[in-house]
Amino acid sequence: MSMGPISELLTVSYPIAETFHSLQGEGAWAGGNAFFIRLGGCDVHCPWCDQKETWPTQHHPRQTVTELVQQAVTAKPSFVVITGGEPLMHDLQPLCKTLKNQGLRLHLETSGAYPLTGQFDWITLSPKPYKLPQAAIYPLANELKVIISQDEDFDWAEMEARKISPGTPLYLQAEWETEAMNEKIFAYILTHSQWRLSLQTHKYLGVR
């Protein structure tokens, strides 16, 4: 998408599953004051996904950049999280540019399955074996978060970690409905010290 005048950017719209103000529950920024923009649309189709309702793009009402930015500014968060679904199915440049113009810090949560659009202060790469990440996303990731739902996923995690820039924080997170995996992740990290545990803190707190 070519970037026209700011007035044109404001009228660009996206399918929005939800927006909400809460604490970031996962990864390096867990506990931080965050405003979430959850875009509709995903064709990665993880069988254990806890956001399957976001998959069909056409099922979600569209909101303009103006509407989304107004909500984010009103929330006064420490950072804005653009998530999904798979947000990179959409051209995020108009939204990112306008949010940045308001001085907001931007975080992205992505599987990396599509090319990166927009400028972000932090990129959480959560690769999925069902649709592999674009090679170009690996050196841009600020953290790697791998979901563990079965024993074989540990091998997948190690394979993905080898593609990430040295020193990038590495997280293992249990799929929510197989919470027993937390014990296996705990034991795994004790013998693989490069990894850290990510918990879905917001779910334990019973908040969004």
UniProtKB/Swiss-Prot annotation:
[4Fe-4S] cluster binds at C42, C46, C49. Its EC number is 4.3.99.3. Pfam families: Fer4_12, Radical_SAM. Belongs to the radical SAM superfamily. 7-carboxy-7-deazaguanine synthase family. Substrate binds at L23, Q24, G25, R38, T83. This is 7-carboxy-7-deazaguanine synthase. S-adenosyl-L-methionine binds at G85, S126, P127, K128. Pathway: Purine metabolism; 7-cyano-7-deazaguanine biosynthesis. It comes from Synechocystis sp. (strain ATCC 27184 / PCC 6803 / Kazusa).
